Design a protein with these regions (language model features):
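S-adenosyl-L-methionine
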Residues: 1-27
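A generic "cationic amphipathic patch" detector
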Residues: 16-19, 30, 68-70, 129
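A short beta-strand-loop structural module common to alpha/beta enzyme folds
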Residues: 22-40
Length: 144
């Protein structure tokens, strides 16, 4: 069984999957992945449709985070040392976060895996932009 781990970061999913005998291909920009590239630049069609049985994606949550609202009224280098406005945050989400999410969905659509997971904090805004069917799963609902 093959797993594609997008935005692999600490490889927490991939490590466990490998221990269980799964073949894992990881993608991230951190230099520790099997494929080190910006997901927006990845030519995923080098793999055939259906190649991966499972896709696990943990897209960056920072552009969708409600915590960013605490930046309003502050000067931040990320925004060019100008005072941050709500409009700037919304524009950043649409210009940075949403394209990454759309590419993730495009990849999932292409591979059409048996299972796919898109992990992101429940309090963030990513769920407002997801176009694929999804279930909201929270480990707290299971007693953890």
């Amino acid at each position: 069984m093959r797993i594609l781990e997008l935005f692999s970061g600490t490889h927490s999913v991939g490590k466990v999957a490998k221990e269980l005998g799964y073949e894992v291909l990881s993608l991230d920009m951190d230099g520790n992945a099997d494929i080190n590239i910006d997901i927006l630049d990845w030519d995923y069609k080098q793999y055939p449709v259906g190649y991966f049985d499972i896709v696990w994606a943990s897209p960056p949550c920072n552009t969708f985070s409600n915590l960013r609202r605490s930046w309003i009224g502050r000067k931040l280098k990320y925004f060019g040392d100008v005072i941050v406005t709500a409009e700037m945050l919304d524009n950043d989400m649409m210009q940075v976060g949403v394209p990454i999410l759309r590419k993730t969905e495009e990849i999932i659509n292409y591979f059409n895996p048996d299972l796919y997971f898109m992990e992101n904090p429940k309090t963030g805004k990513m769920k407002d932009f997801v176009t694929r069917p999804f279930y909201d799963v929270d480990y707290c609902a299971y007693g953890f």
